[in-house]
Regions:
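Positively charged n-region of N-terminal signal peptides that target proteins for export
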Residues: 1-4
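C-terminal motif of bacterial Sec signal peptides marking the signal peptidase cleavage site
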Residues: 16-19
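Bacterial signal peptide processing site
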Residues: 21-23
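Von Willebrand factor
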Residues: 31-160, 163-167
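Acidic/histidine-rich, surface-exposed loop or edge segments in extracytoplasmic proteins
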Residues: 31-45, 129-135, 219-224
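Extended amphipathic alpha-helical interaction segments
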Residues: 134-196
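VWA/integrin I-like adhesion module and closely mimicked acidic/polar interface patches used
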Residues: 172-228
Length: 258
């Protein structure tokens, strides 16, 4: 009986230590974040707001770029869902100074301050590269394939714990998959917009694996100050709201002008 109790106690202790070790290991692993940036390169969007966009982008990156955060830049054009439509900026942590000597608390605090300064400079350098990539000139596209990007985005999210999305576009879909400009009104009602989104989402699902956008924390859309088709914005947002909802995104899309 004593032997049974002894082995039972040892087993519980081992399980407890294993659980603690697992918990420490999991806690020590930092979350990986992704910022997805998209810019409309179609002919329907002029470049008059470039300066304001750049100012807004810098503010956005300063607020949300942090350690263990990668950034991907995508163009919105006729090849939006292409695998090559992604310019990556991976976060590389600066090296820490390793010393075997015992350090005072003050020295440890100083070392940490110096390390944080390195992180800040790393992020600043990356932000400049991202802004440059977003403003890079490309050939103007006659198509605006927007909804198609949910497929590559879903694939990207598999390697991350969370993500945010920022889109600079009038978001007027104009491609072979779906064209908002064929009729007098892009979406005559919100219910119509939702129904079309449901059909389009099913069509997108058939093109690849299951679309999962649940890791996205928030989505921001920045439209031109003076869009050419203001009437589209009455019901069109409901279309994209439904697309993202069906993709398991639990938040809302924040629409704004510069």
């Amino acid at each position: 009986m004593k032997k049974i109790l002894f082995f039972t106690t040892i087993s519980v202790l081992i399980l407890s230590l294993t659980s603690c070790h697992k918990e420490v290991t999991e806690t020590a692993t930092p979350e990986r974040s992704l910022i997805i940036l998209m810019k409309d390169k179609s002919a329907s969007v002029s470049g008059t707001d470039t300066e304001k966009e750049t100012k807004h982008l810098k503010s956005y990156l300063a607020q949300y770029m942090a350690e263990n955060t990668d950034v991907v830049v995508m163009d919105i054009n006729s090849n939006s869902n292409s695998r090559t439509n992604a310019k990556w900026f991976y976060y590389k942590a600066p090296k820490r100074q390793v010393s075997t000597r015992n350090k005072s608390k003050k020295q440890e605090e100083l070392d940490e301050m110096m390390y944080q300064e390195k992180i800040y400079k790393t992020l600043q350098t990356t932000q400049k590269k991202v802004v440059k990539a977003m403003n890079a000139k490309t050939a103007s596209s006659q198509e605006t394939a927007i909804v198609e990007v949910v497929i590559p985005i879903s694939d990207m999210l598999k390697d991350y714990d969370k993500a945010s999305v920022l889109i600079y576009s009038d978001l007027i879909q104009e491609s072979g998959f779906r064209n908002f400009t064929k009729g007098q009104w892009a979406m005559p009602s919100k219910s119509y917009a939702t129904d079309v989104a449901t059909k389009d989402f099913e069509r997108l699902q058939q093109q690849g694996s299951e679309i999962d956008l649940s890791k996205i924390s928030f989505v921001d859309v920045v439209t031109p100050n003076n869009p050419k088709n203001e009437k589209f914005y009455v019901n069109m947002p409901s279309y994209f709201d439904e697309i993202f909802r069906l993709g398991k995104y639990s938040g809302t899309i924040d629409w704004k002008k510069l």
